[in-house]
Amino acid sequence: MKTKSINILNLNVPCHCHCRYCLLEWNGKTIGIDYDRSINYAKSFYKWLKENKPELNFTYYFGYSMEHPKLFEAIKFMQETNSPGGEFLQFDGMKERTKDELFDFLAEIKNAGIKLIDLTFYGLEDYHDKFAGRLGDYNLLMNTLDVALSLGINVEVGIPVIKENLDQLNELVDLFSKKNVNLFLFTPHSIGRGKTLINSKITLDDYESMSKNVKNYFNRNTNRTQYEWLNNPPKEVSNRTLTISLLSTNIEDIENKTFEDVIKELEEMDYYFYSTVPSFNELLIKYADKNDKLLYSKKDLYAIYRKRYIQENKINIIDITDERYSGSIRY
């Protein structure tokens, strides 16, 4: 297993929604540290990497909302380090803005170098607002989309597909396919608050009932039944990204370690976790239910299998796959 990149994560950005499937289980409180302290640490780490491990990529990341207290400073740093956030921002959970305010803000975003924004729609207006936990969120996102396009900013729109919004997909796809956006449909995960959606997952029959137009935006290769994953398993992973999550509970300990020791500690955690918990392909052989017709992404199904394996074997282990905390991502 080869470490390919280092990800510095500081979840200090407030989100103004309370979505039903929030990966980060946002509850109104940020868990990161103040920006200046995080950026100073990230800058020092990046400088050390360039001098000592130039083969490793580097990313600075602050979560799924762009309401960063020092957004433009963060964008500049992300551009300096070739982090994705230097050109791409996720716009879910933003604070309310009028259309004029959105125009001014998005114009600033564009001038700062942002080329692409991402928006998530859960359904038509009433359903979307209930799912997002905020009245008016649908109209805010739609206004954001229209203003961004008028300014020449590229927009991608994702729609998580569950049983509850199946009857809304034709209208949604018809709406967004007429706009100049990159549209994609996907099955939501069962991680974080997403575990509450497990009974709402769509089946193969649900997929077959979709119109051809809707199917055009849904990637069946990445959303399969358990038997389909078993019958055509993915290649085994060989690379990993190490994530350093900066929290009030760990920042002093992290700052007191050398950068090399931080990397070594995370690699040891990674090795221990994956020598204890089998790979996705191994768990497929052990657990795949050939009669289950639900559709899963690999990320979702592997999370379900890992949880089952850990519980069945009564294993006490730190979950290094929890994307809120320090850990690793294998790919």
Label each PLM-derived region with a short phrase:
Residues 42, 98-108, 167-169:
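Short, acidic/polar
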Residues 1-25, 50-62, 245-250:
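N-terminal pre-triad scaffold of radical SAM enzymes
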